[in-house]
Amino acid sequence: MNGTEGPNFYVPMSNKTGVVRSPFDYPQYYLAEPWQYSALAAYMFLLILLGLPINFMTLFVTIQHKKLRTPLNYILLNLVFANHFMVLCGFTVTMYTSMHGYFIFGPTGCYIEGFFATLGGEVALWSLVVLAVERYIVVCKPMANFRFGENHAIMGVAFTWIMALSCAAPPLFGWSRYIPEGMQCSCGVDYYTLKPEVNNESFVIYMFIVHFTIPLIVIFFCYGRLLCTVKEAAAQQQESLTTQKAEKEVTRMVVIMVVFFLICWVPYAYVAFYIFTHQGSNFGPVFMTVPAFFAKSSAIYNPVIYIVLNKQFRNCLITTLCCGKNPFGDEDGSSAATSKTEASSVSSSQVSPA
C-alpha cells in the first residue's frame, strides 16, 4: 500500500519513514509546503467572500419581489439555497482547517463537514435533474399541455432533499464513512479504502450509480430530446416566435448551469473513481485536492448565471440595490419584460419574452 490507513483516516503517503501523523492532531506539512495550505485557505476565503453576498442577495431579492416567486424559480432558489448552505457550513470550516494545515476539528467535525459538503452538492445535482425534467415536459409536451404549478415545484424541492439525504446521511449511520481527503483539510466520502467494517465498497458503488450516473443520464436524455423538439418546432413554425424565444432563453440558462456543474464536478468524480478502482496505487495529495477544491466553486456560478441571464431578476436586483428605484427606467419589469422563467408555469400561448 502506498498510503497510511488509520482508524478514521487515510493519508496518501507511505509511513516507511515514520513521518505520517493523524490529520486530526498534527499539521500535514510533510504532504505539501505550508504555502500551499495558505493558498488553499486564501482560495476558500475568496469563495466565501463571493459566495455569501451573491447567494444571499439572490435569495433576498426573490423574497422581496413577489413576481419572482414563480414555480420554476422555486427550484432555482433551492439550488441557490443549497449553495449558500455549503458556503456557510462547509467553506468556513475548510478555510479554517487549511490555515492550520490539518483538520483541527477532529473526526466528529470531519463527519459534519463531509455531510454538509455532500448534501449541498447533491441538492444542486438533483435540482438540475428536476429542472431538466421540467424543461422536457414543458417544451417536448409528452404529457400534452402540462402546467408546472406551485405544488409540482414544492414536490420537486422535496425530492431533491430526499435524494440528497439518501446520499449524504448513510455514512453518519455506519454505511461508509467521512474522512479527510487530499491534503487532509477537507472531508468527503472514503474513496480510498474498501473498509469492509462499514461496507464501504457497496456504498461507493451505490453512490456512483444512483447519485451520479443516473442523474447524468436523465439530464442528457431530457436535453437531447429538448434540442430535437426545439429544432422541429422552429422548422415547422408550430409555436409563435415569442413563445419559442421565451422557451429557448429558459432552456439556455438551465443548460449553461448543467455545463458548469459538469465542468466543476466531473474532474472530482473521475479522480475519486480512479482512486477507488486503483486501491493502493501511488498518487500525491494534490491529485485529489485540486479537483475537490475546484468543485467547491460550483457554489458561486449558479446565482451568477441566474443574474446574468434573467432580465427580470436583474431589474429587481437593481431596484433593491437602489432603494426601490431603478435608474435605468425598467424598475418593475414592464409587461414586455416578463421573466423568462415564467415560460414554464403558463401555457405556451401565454408566454412573453424577457
From Swiss-Prot:
Transmembrane annotation, as ranges: 37-61, 74-96, 111-133, 153-173, 203-224, 253-274, 287-308
Key words, A-Z: Cell projection, Chromophore, Disulfide bond, G-protein coupled receptor, Glycoprotein, Lipoprotein, Membrane, Palmitate, Phosphoprotein, Photoreceptor protein, Receptor, Retinal protein, Sensory transduction, Transducer, Transmembrane, Transmembrane helix, Vision
Annotated site location: Plays an important role in the conformation switch to the active conformation: E113
Lipidation (S-palmitoyl cysteine): C322, C323
GO molecular function: 11-cis retinal binding; G protein-coupled photoreceptor activity
Side Cytoplasmic, residues: 62-73, 134-152, 225-252, 309-354
Main location: membrane
Motif interval(s): 'Ionic lock' involved in activated form stabilization: 134-136
Positions where N6-(retinylidene)lysine occurs in the chain: K296
GO cellular component: membrane; photoreceptor disc membrane; photoreceptor outer segment; plasma membrane
Disulfide bond is among the record's keywords: yes
Physiological role: Photoreceptor required for image-forming vision at low light intensity. Required for photoreceptor cell viability after birth. Light-induced isomerization of 11-cis to all-trans retinal triggers a conformational change that activates signaling via G-proteins. Subsequent receptor phosphorylation mediates displacement of the bound G-protein alpha subunit by arrestin and terminates signaling.
Protein name: Rhodopsin
Organism: Xenopus laevis
Gene: rho
